[in-house]
Curated annotation (Swiss-Prot):
ATP binds at Y35, D470, G507. Pathway: Purine metabolism; IMP biosynthesis via de novo pathway; 5-amino-1-(5-phospho-D-ribosyl)imidazole from N(2)-formyl-N(1)-(5-phospho-D-ribosyl)glycinamide: step 1/2. Substrate binds at S77, H78, N79, H80, R99, Q223, E295, S296, Q297, S510. It is an enzyme of class 6 (ligase). Belongs to the FGAMS family. Keywords: ATP-binding, Cytoplasm, Ligase, Magnesium, Metal-binding, Nucleotide-binding, Purine biosynthesis. It is found in: Cytoplasm. It comes from Thermococcus gammatolerans (strain DSM 15229 / JCM 11827 / EJ3). It comes from the Archaea. Mg(2+) 1 binds at E76, N508. The keyword Ligase applies. Its main location: cytoplasm. This is Phosphoribosylformylglycinamidine synthase subunit PurL. One of its GO terms (biological process) is 'de novo' IMP biosynthetic process.
Length: 712
């Protein structure tokens, strides 16, 4: 909290707050809880379209899938905790987002985990990577919610740090919707789940400042995961919701009981009384302050009518969950805490829930600049990029996740997007994307590119995009360059979503991601939902005897590319998003899939065309011959054509008889070769640039465990 904020609080209250009141105010006025630095910009984002039932403002967003089914989606970060204690930090990140979905009245059905680390050469980064993955795997597997996709990337700027974002999706029937706020006084507040301990005390305050070198001291701010209680909480909560007697529901995440109760009561102008001494404790001798701001996990707060308390309580007892009435809602908009009969806090509730925004100084920076494309042999360029940890298969990661529990997973990890079966005819596509290298060079274009890539990934599995959520990972907003990059990012996210007719239904902002004065790159992560006809999903890999077509225009855009990163080249221009072309190509590919004209589709993104072709060869265990000189392009340099990361592009493989019909769907569309054989062959004007057996490509592609010191 800043000195001017403390002064404002004293003025509005007309007195000095006591220790408990200061603790609650510090939690609620933290960046993590209040979004005080991001709110002025987030209002630029579009939040409504024909699919949106509920936009931002509650624990998760809701999208209409069909008349019987609504989809609930949210995304969260657990960056600071995971950097300090990777296993517990990542596991509790999963638990928190699952409860966000649950408290809308939905059953969580799938997770995505976009995760980022420093270079794997360093032991500390390998340790963070292995234990973050283990934390996500253990928690998700034990609660029975499959992790079906995500991203795993490595970057110098994250040395000794980690970004752990987790998205979750759930499904519900419309009649089971429960809001996170009350609309009447006199409701009883029931706390259910785990006992309250000292873990996570000051967790949101810890998440609202930079990490120091001595991170071990911060371990007490990391919460302790208990997936077995969470599993019981999921089933008990849904059973309680299905009675129709739950009036409001919130999970206890950041800010603990203070945040959950004040937000639940204050949203519509009511107040709350909390009897903190009734809270079941895990540790003896806890103070009212510790009880009110503890972030112990696996806890939910229910609001029910007094006459329904026993019925709801019986459901919790069936699941052997401890529950207690810890307070009630009141007409007067105040937040009052009692401890053993004594009033120990009494604040106007809006002082907790309506935090003034802060607009920091904005200072543009320029990281872009003209750079000569290095003169590098084609084979060396390909080997560098194909062998990059960012390009390698993440099978080592997702094989630790039970991605098939619940039996809905139609498309498994490794494809452009995951697909989950919702009914016999339709599936839900779910994907997350971001590119910090592009965002660092040009935050506006990088953000637009993240949205465009999400759309391409959804389209590549035949899905019509429905809605988006965003997770914005940045360094300190007090740095003028960082705050400018944040504002530019939000502008890019807004413009791209509007162009596609998409809305953001939920999101998360994580500031202060830096270690010892070293800020991370701007890292917006966008997750998208789409609706797909199950029988129309194309393959992601090649099969024998098909033509290979490239959709879209390739430009000499190597700035922020995987090739430049591997060669250590800085600068260049980030790829520019042409929204009209992006939209037209997406519509064309969707139409081609609907008409059954294409067998396989893959979008072109990180690593460029060469990587996309090689991935399709490995996925289908089938070779190809492709002449890159035929690619629709604004450059005649083979390196630029092969490794540029221009947007708006797809590779399609299809039977020759569909060629004429396909040509009519696109402005830029050219046949560059054929599938077949056991080698991947790249040509330029008929001359061979590179020939690699698909078996060799596959061996390299699956070599991530070797970088971790594990033998296959």
């Amino acid at each position: 909290m800043f000195p001017h904020e403390e002064k404002l609080i004293r003025e509005r209250l007309g007195r000095e707050p006591n220790e408990l009141e200061w603790a609650m105010l510090e939690v609620m006025w933290s960046e993590h809880a209040s979004y005080k630095s991001s709110r002025p910009w987030l209002k630029l984002l579009p939040t409504e379209n024909e699919h949106v039932i509920l936009g931002p403002g509650e624990d998760a967003g809701i999208v209409k899938f069909d008349d019987e089914t609504w989809v609930v989606v949210g995304i969260e970060s657990h960056n600071h905790p995971s950097a300090v204690e990777p296993y517990g930090g990542a596991a509790t990140g999963v638990g928190g987002i699952v409860r966000d979905i649950l408290c809308m009245g939905a059953r969580p059905i799938a997770l995505l985990d976009p995760i980022r680390f420093g270079p794997l050469e360093k032991e500390r980064n390998r340790y963070l990577f292995e234990y973050v993955v283990k934390g996500i795997a253990d928690y998700g597997n034990r609660i029975g919610v499959p992790t079906v996709g995500g991203e795993t990337e490595f970057d110098e700027s994250l040395d000794s740090y980690t970004l752990v974002n987790v998205a979750c999706v759930g499904i519900m029937r419309p009649e089971h919707l429960v809001h996170s706020y009350v609309t009447e006084a006199g409701l009883k507040l029931i706390l259910v789940g785990n006992r309250t301990g000292r873990d996570g005390v000051h967790g949101v305050t810890f998440a609202s400042e930079e990490l120091s070198e001595n991170t071990e001291e911060d371990r007490s701010a990391v919460q302790i995961p208990d997936p077995f209680t969470e599993k019981l909480l999921i089933e008990a909560t849904l059973e309680a919701v299905y009675t129709g007697r739950v009036k409001a529901l919130k999970d206890l995440g950041g800010g603990g009981l203070t945040c959950a109760a004040s937000e639940m009561a204050g949203k519509k102008g009511f107040g709350a009384v909390i009897y903190a001494d009734r809270v079941p404790l895990r540790e003896p001798g806890m103070t009212p302050t510790e009880v009110m701001i503890s972030e112990s996990q696996e806890r939910m707060l229910f609001a029910v009518k007094p006459e329904d308390v026993e019925e709801i309580g019986r459901i919790f007892e069936e699941y052997e969950l401890e529950w207690t009435v810890v307070g009630e809602t009141i007409e007067e908009p105040r937040f009052v805490v009692y401890w053993k009969g004594e009033k120990v806090a009494d604040l106007p509730i809006e002082l907790l829930t309506e935090v003034p925004t802060i607009e920091w100084e904005l200072k543009p920076y320029s990281a872009e600049g003209p750079v000569e494309t290095p003169d590098v042999p084609f084979e060396r360029a390909f080997d560098l990029v194909w062998g990059s940890p960012n390009i390698l298969s993440k099978r080592w990661v997702w094989e630790q996740y039970d991605h098939e529990v619940q039996g809905r997973t139609v498309l498994k990890p490794g494809r452009d997007a995951a697909v989950l079966k919702i009914n016999d005819e339709y599936g839900l596509a779910f994907v997350a994307d971001g590119n910090p290298n592009h965002s660092y060079l040009n935050p506006y274009q990088g953000a637009m590119g993240a949205v465009a890539e999400v759309v391409r990934n959804l389209v590549s599995v035949g899905a019509e995009p429905l809605a988006l959520v965003d997770n914005l990972n940045f360094a300190s907003p007090e740095r003028p360059e960082v705050y400018w990059s944040f504002a530019e990012t939000v502008r890019g996210l807004a413009d791209a979503a509007r162009a596609f007719g998409l809305a953001y239904v939920s999101g998360n902002v994580s500031f202060y991601n830096e270690v010892v004065d070293r800020p991370i790159k701007p890292t917006p992560v966008v997750a998208g939902l789409g609706k797909v006809k199950l029988e129309a999903i194309p393959n992601g890999g090649f099969e024998e005897g098909l033509l290979i077509g490239v959709v879209g225009l390739t430009k000499p855009e190597l700035g922020g590319s995987e090739l430049f990163a591997r060669l250590g080249v800085e600068g260049g221009l980030a790829p520019r998003v042409n929204l009209e072309e992006e939209k037209a190509n997406a519509n064309g590919v969707l139409e081609a899939i609907r008409r059954g004209l294409v067998r396989a589709v893959h979008d072109v993104s990180r690593g460029g065309l060469a990587v996309a072709l090689a991935k399709m060869a490995v996925a289908g265990n089938t070779g190809f011959t492709a002449d890159l000189s035929k690619v629709p392009s604004e450059t005649t340099n083979p390196i630029e054509v092969a490794f540029s990361e221009s947007h708006g592009r797809y590779i399609v493989a299809f039977p020759e008889e569909n060629l004429e019909e396909l040509k009519g769907l696109f402005k830029h569309f050219v046949i560059i070769g054929r599938t077949g054989g056991s080698d991947a062959v790249f040509l330029w004007n008929g001359w061979e640039l590179l020939r690699k057996p698909v078996s060799e490509l596959k061996a390299v592609h699956e070599s991530l465990p070797m970088l971790l010191g594990e033998e296959e």
